[in-house]
A protein has these predicted regions:
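Mid-to-C-terminal functional-domain signal that highlights helix-capping/loop sites
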Residues: 1-179
Length: 179
């Protein structure tokens, strides 16, 4: 890590191989609940309410293929799907992380997924939201976590009728209906 600072011993970060990489979704054009006809009531979704109060649903059948979704708008955020734990984390992007573009890194730290930022070439703990290998400009930075709810599409829409949701048309050649 030439020219970078480390918050952990570099030898504790291990290459996990290309199977841990998945292409991120960058600023997908979110749909309204009414436009999301591809979802059925019992589909599993991860839901968040961002800092502006907007509800967003991340269907498991889509996020499992991408692992990282960067959402722009009033309250920029990054959603991270953890394949091992079958869970999702969400972080607000602000200050020095506002323009970060996160993606899967194919690295593990303490057995957990590490994400990378394409802008600063830094490595981050997906679990804690802290940089592991970083520029000095990121010294002391920690991403602010948002609560995430795992539920069904029907339950999420009932609680958040104005929710937005990831589109099935992502620009990637995937059959999201089969998962």
């Amino acid at each position: 890590a030439i020219g970078k600072s480390c918050s952990v011993a570099p030898h504790e970060i291990h290459w996990a191989g290309p199977k841990y990489y998945s292409a991120p979704l960058r600023n997908p054009q979110l749909l309204s609940a009414a436009q999301a006809s591809y979802l059925v009531p019992n589909d599993l979704v991860f839901g968040i309410v961002d800092k502006s109060g907007a509800a967003i649903a991340f269907p498991l059948r889509i996020i499992t293929w991408h692992h990282v979704v960067d959402v722009e708008g009033h309250s920029p955020l990054t959603a991270l799907y953890d394949e091992q734990n079958k869970s999702m984390l969400a972080y607000v992007r602000s200050g020095p992380t506002l323009h970060c573009k996160y993606s899967s890194s194919s690295f593990l730290y303490s057995g957990e997924h590490v994400i990378s930022d394409e802008q600063t070439h830094s490595l981050w703990s997906a679990r804690t939201g802290r940089p592991l290998v970083y520029d000095q400009s990121l010294q002391g930075v920690q991403l602010q976590a948002l609560p995430v709810v795992a539920t069904t599409w029907a339950a999420w829409v009932k609680e958040h009728p104005t929710t937005k949701v990831l589109p099935i048309e992502t620009g990637f050649d995937r059959d999201y209906r089969s998962r």
